């Protein structure tokens, strides 16, 4: 297992280096939240680009204090250059304009605001934006379109959350980041498990079987329940995948009109 992850780390570092060079960049930038996924991307990026890998810390009005402190500790431990841009003032303006906005609207606004800061920094510093969404999130559509899902390249987009966790252990990510419950930190009390209804340890095996069995054909509930999965889990997961599939697609462009 140790050898497998040594090869995976080498593969992902090679991916980052080649794909960044292919696009004509020498520097990268990414959002560092204090969570597991961005910590893994941050350490991988630092391995490849050293001081040319820059992290942006972008706390909102409702970001947990430990999110920022964990991100800062990671930067210190791995010598990661960073800049902090508080999005709290913009968050406050949105909330003052839209007093009845749901938690989802507020969270999506903050997610897209962070991506705006990342792409502004990208332009200013000629850096490529690196994504931090894992495969579990991508399959379930558990992310904000043109927010945290937006990026130029993503080294962990084909790793399920449980695989990212194992990779993080081999990268020596601090224990307090490893141990904290996964959360997008978009509103007080949020956690991935509360939003999704199940922990990733339960969801990921199902997602792996769905990908293996139904990559090119419709998903069948009966096939999955026969494998021993709980019917409610399967129904909820299939619903999320189908409902949010559009988030992984490029915009559909109308074909050129021919008046003849």
UniProtKB/Swiss-Prot annotation:
ATP binds at residues 31-38, 132, 161, 183. It catalyses: deamido-NAD(+) + NH4(+) + ATP = AMP + diphosphate + NAD(+) + H(+). Keywords: ATP-binding, Ligase, Magnesium, Metal-binding, NAD, Nucleotide-binding. InterPro entries: NAD/GMP_synthase (IPR022310), NAD_synthase (IPR003694), NH(3)-dep_NAD(+)_synth (IPR022926), Rossmann-like_a/b/a_fold (IPR014729). The keyword Ligase applies. It is an enzyme of class 6 (ligase). Its EC number is 6.3.1.5. One of its GO terms (molecular function) is metal ion binding. Pathway: Cofactor biosynthesis; NAD(+) biosynthesis; NAD(+) from deamido-NAD(+) (ammonia route): step 1/1. Mg(2+) binds at residues 37, 137. It holds the Pfam family NAD_synthase. Deamido-NAD(+) binds at residue 112. The keyword Ribosomal protein does not apply. GO terms for biological process: NAD biosynthetic process. GO terms for cellular component: cytoplasm. Coiled coil: none annotated. Belongs to the NAD synthetase family. NCBIfam families: nadE, PRK13980.1. PANTHER family: GLUTAMINE-DEPENDENT NAD(+) SYNTHETASE (PTHR23090:SF9), NH 3 /GLUTAMINE-DEPENDENT NAD + SYNTHETASE (PTHR23090). Catalyzes the ATP-dependent amidation of deamido-NAD to form NAD. Uses ammonia as a nitrogen source. Homodimer. This is NH(3)-dependent NAD(+) synthetase. It comes from Helicobacter acinonychis (strain Sheeba).
């Amino acid at each position: 297992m140790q050898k497998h992850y040594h090869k995976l780390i080498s593969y992902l570092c090679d991916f980052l280096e080649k794909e960044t060079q292919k696009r004509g960049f020498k520097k990268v930038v990414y959002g560092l939240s204090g969570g597991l996924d961005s910590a893994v991307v941050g350490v991988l990026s630092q391995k490849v680009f050293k001081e040319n890998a820059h992290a942006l810390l972008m706390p909102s009005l409702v970001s947990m204090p430990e999110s920022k402190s964990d991100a800062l500790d990671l930067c210190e431990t791995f010598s990661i250059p960073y800049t902090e841009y508080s999005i709290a003032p913009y968050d406050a303006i949105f909330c003052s304009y839209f007093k009845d906005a749901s938690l989802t609207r507020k969270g999506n606004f903050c997610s897209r605001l962070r991506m705006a800061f990342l792409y502004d920094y990208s332009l200013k510093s000629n850096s490529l934006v690196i994504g931090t969404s894992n495969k579990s999130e991508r399959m379930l559509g558990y992310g904000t379109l043109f927010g945290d899902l937006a990026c130029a390249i993503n080294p962990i987009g084909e790793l399920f959350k449980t695989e990212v966790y194992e990779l993080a252990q081999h990268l020596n990510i601090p224990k307090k980041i490893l141990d904290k419950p996964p959360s997008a930190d978009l509103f007080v009390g949020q956690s991935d498990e509360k939003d999704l209804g199940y922990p990733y340890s339960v969801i990921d095996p199902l997602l792996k079987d769905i990908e293996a069995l139904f990559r090119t054909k419709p998903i069948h509930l009966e096939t999955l329940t026969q494998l021993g999965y709980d019917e409610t889990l399967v129904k909820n997961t299939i619903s999320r995948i189908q409902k949010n599939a559009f988030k992984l697609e490029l915009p559909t462009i109308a074909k050129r009109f021919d008046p003849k």
